Amino acid sequence: MAEKKKSKLKITLVKSLIGRPETQRRTVRALGLTRMHQTVEQNDVPQIRGMVNRIRHLVKVEEA
């Protein structure tokens, strides 16, 4: 019974949210990011990829 290892994404907030639209702020918060240079690990699923794509100019993404 071989289980597939789920891949993860390391997402780091590198730009400030000051002056950003509310939709971008909500997307960052929904990813679990609350402050600058904070890193979270999320599952690599289409929903998370879509959220990251909307704020790609604010975050740094790495494969975990």
From Swiss-Prot:
Keywords: Ribonucleoprotein, Ribosomal protein. It holds the Pfam family Ribosomal_L30. One of its GO terms (biological process) is translation. It comes from the Bacteria. InterPro entries: Ribo_uL30_ferredoxin-like_sf, Ribosomal_uL30_bac-type, Ribosomal_uL30_CS, Ribosomal_uL30_ferredoxin-like. Transmembrane segments: none annotated. Belongs to the universal ribosomal protein uL30 family. Part of the 50S ribosomal subunit. This is Large ribosomal subunit protein uL30. It comes from Desulforudis audaxviator (strain MP104C). The lineage of its organism: Bacteria, Bacillati, Bacillota, Clostridia, Thermoanaerobacterales. The gene is rpmD.
